[in-house]
């Protein structure tokens, strides 16, 4: 990575800031950039800076389906054009079907008056472009930096850093991931469940072109998604019980290609090539609250959801937009941006929305796990009915888009 990023050593005592954001992933970097562009003095603390994105490197296995609301936010932050032009795979159609009942539902951008349903983009590309924009926006980057503790006071919060330094701010934003050490330090618990599944991921070449279509098939063991990449391949996310995931990861390449072809119902023809495979565990986790004194949670630190709807990062970016708007309104009204009543608006709105979405995704996962013939038949009837109810289907698509 280019070492001229001028990241500030955390040992230096910085002057008081409006906001300190901890966690430099996609959501944390977007939050720091959004708040800085809104005129708040902002610092971003991260233990490890991202590696430079390389257009000549293999497409990263971790990809995100960016919804239109996320694209709008990234465009407001001045980074979307760079992301799109670098390597973003647009999709205009989505086909979802049930392996057991055969019921299917289709979504089409043109029928909804949109150009695209979304874009499939590498996580590290989004993160890198956000980091590239931080310096010009005036964000102070403390990297490497780790927070060992913090103490909220009447008018500020003081962070104790691992190197012995301190930092003071009006508000601390924790965007430090699902395991969130800061959430634990704040004494905020979580609720949820372990799905006892792993998502197997890889990029594959197929016999037929994907035609800018996202495919998702609900199988007895979990959903399989084929997401269109900019280079013509598809990114797969195959949710499987843990033992089955281990078996699939251990298959030789041809056996894996054959099984994946069957699992995908050969909708794109034979699967002809694959990258090395990886897997990550799946769980549902929701923070019991999103705020503490001069402290808020953001992104995966607040909520982790099943990937079947592809909404995890989109929910985090909606957190960013809501927090920015909340703080801008508070400043315009002459209020303290770290005051409990100010943060309550953000926490109430986002926790309510995130909880409804997370429980909806969880319910969908449970419904498609049904194996009873009667329940499978009922599920099929419901899906076919939804596909015929254009207004309801359009509202579902708009919700997924973030509108």
Where are the regions a protein language model picked out?
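Glycine-rich FAD pyrophosphate-binding loop
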Residues: 36-59
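Conserved FAD-binding catalytic core of PHBH/FMO-like flavoproteins
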Residues: 74, 156-158, 165, 171-277
């Amino acid at each position: 990575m280019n070492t001229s990023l001028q990241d500030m050593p955390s040992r230096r005592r910085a002057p008081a800031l409006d906001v300190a954001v901890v966690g430099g992933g996609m959501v944390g970097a977007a939050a720091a950039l959004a708040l800085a562009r809104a005129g708040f003095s902002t610092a971003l603390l991260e233990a490890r800076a991202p590696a430079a994105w390389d257009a000549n490197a293999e497409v990263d296995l971790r990809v995100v389906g960016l919804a239109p609301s996320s694209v709008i936010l990234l465009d407001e932050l001045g980074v979307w054009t760079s992301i799109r032009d670098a390597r973003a795979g647009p999709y205009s159609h989505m086909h979802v079907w049930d392996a057991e009942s055969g019921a299917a539902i289709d979504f089409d951008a043109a029928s909804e008056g949109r150009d695209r349903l979304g874009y499939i983009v590498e996580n590290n590309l989004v993160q890198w472009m956000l980091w590239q924009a931080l310096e010009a926006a005036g964000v102070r980057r403390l990297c490497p930096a780790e927070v060992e503790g913090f103490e909220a006071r009447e008018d500020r919060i003081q962070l104790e850093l691992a190197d012995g330094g301190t930092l003071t701010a009006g508000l601390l934003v924790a965007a430090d991931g699902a395991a969130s050490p800061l959430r634990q330090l704040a004494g905020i618990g979580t609720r949820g469940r372990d799905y006892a599944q792993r998502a197997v991921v890889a990029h594959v070449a197929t016999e037929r072109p994907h035609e800018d279509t996202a495919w998702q098939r609900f199988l007895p063991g979990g959903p399989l998604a084929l997401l269109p990449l900019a280079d013509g391949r598809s990114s797969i996310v195959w949710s499987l019980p843990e033992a089955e995931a281990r078996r699939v990861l251990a298959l030789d390449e041809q056996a894996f290609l054959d099984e994946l072809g069957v699992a995908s119902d050969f909708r794109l023809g034979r699967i002809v090539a694959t990258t090395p495979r990886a897997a990550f565990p799946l769980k549902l986790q929701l923070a019991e609250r999103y705020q503490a004194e001069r402290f808020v949670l953001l992104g995966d630190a607040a909520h982790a959801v099943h990937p079947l709807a592809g909404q995890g990062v989109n929910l985090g970016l909606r957190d960013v937009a809501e927090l920015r708007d909340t703080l801008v309104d508070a400043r315009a009204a002459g209020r303290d941006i770290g005051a409990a009543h100010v943060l309550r608006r953000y926490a109430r709105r986002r926790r309510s929305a995130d909880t409804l979405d997370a429980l909806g995704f969880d319910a969908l996962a449970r419904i498609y796990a049904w194996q009873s013939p009667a329940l499978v038949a009922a599920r099929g009837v419901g899906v076919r009915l939804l596909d015929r109810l254009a207004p309801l289907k359009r509202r579902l698509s708009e919700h997924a888009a973030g509108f």
